[in-house]
Amino acid sequence: MDAPLTLIGSGMAALGLVRQLRERDARRPITLITADSGDDYSKPLLSTGFAKRLPPERLAARSALEVADQLGVVMRPHTRVTAIDPAARRLSIGAEILPYGELVIATGAAPRVPFAIPEAVATRVFTINDLDDYRGFYAALEALGRPARVTIIGAGLVGCEFANDLSAGGHRVSLVAPETTPLPRLLPEPLGRALGNAFADAGIDVNLGRQLEALAAEGSQVAVHLDDGQALEADLVLVATGLAPRTALAAAAGLAVSDAGIRVDRQLRSSQPGIYALGDVACVAGVNAMYVQPLQASAKALAATLAGTPTEVSYGAWPILVKTPLLPCVALPPHRPLARWRLEGEGADLAALAEDEDGRLIGFALTGACVRRKVELARAAPALLV
């Protein structure tokens, strides 16, 4: 029997690829090896569940067993690949050796935690990047038996979405970040200020321009010490300080990697024959776009390639929809040199148009009522990868 197509990972990228492949070939042997539960869930829902008090089982569309049965694959959950031998086309899982025919690395990205977490508070400090993480944080909230005081460290996409969601769920939220406005990578300052104001108006304690100095245990609470002398009291702390592609396994196997991920071409091929990368771990022709539409486009292109039709992926001008109902936000960050932001609108209903030196639109950011312009502006903006 031929060695199977093997995927490391079972998130949206991996399962999206398998579904695309099964449309082309129902019988090809496929094995999925994943460090987590292997349940099928939509990752974007992780930052919308607490407002509705959704238990983890409500987020999972199918269990790992159901996924394996539906897609006709071998699923190995809670299993870590320890080494890849590209020359022999073999994987190691501890002492176990598994041959593969072709390999797809879809290990995603891991939360970046840029500070030490003292052991005394470790059980009360969380990151949420997958369903297992959600399970842990949900259990901690439920164990309190009352609305929690949650301090979120980080005001990027993940931090802002969870701040909105937890606040909507009745929890007392503090948001801490060194930047002066929320979503600094997506929104220019006037729009970021509008989002910060919307958070503050909703009762979120917004602490921007502040550095975390220390976390310390104070009885059953966590004291979050800031550089202005404040000590915020929290039942739980959620760290949302960015993501880093999980490249260690690939790097150890000799694949070309960078801080942006495993380097692959537009056919998702790595520097080693027979090995591909997909999703948040992949840097495609110099671009790592950790959002759903690029992931889906990559899965579709790679499925065609693996089925015998080499296909290059293209990314359109796909805006990012931020899940902050307190103030809807949409952004298409410019990926070409920016000359200026041109601001339109008033109050919290703002449009910021990114222009190059020749006045051409190269990106945009929208808040409030202006988000309705996203389709019109996306049509006028340049594609991310063509």
Q: Where are each of the predicted segments found?
A:
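Mid-to-C-terminal Rossmann-like scaffold of FAD/NAD(P)H-dependent oxidoreductases
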Residues: D2-P4, S10, E23, V281-K374
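Beta1-alpha1 glycine-rich phosphate/pyrophosphate-binding loop at the start
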Residues: D2-V73, D165-L186
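Short hydrophobic core segments
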Residues: I8, L98-A110, L232-G242, A299
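Rossmann-like dinucleotide-binding cores of NAD(P)H-dependent redox enzymes
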Residues: A60, R149, L157-A214, L295, ...
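Glycine-rich dinucleotide-binding loop and its adjacent helix/turn
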Residues: T107-G169
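FAD-site-proximal beta/loop scaffold in flavoenzymes
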Residues: V121-R146, A223-H225, A231-A297, A301-A304
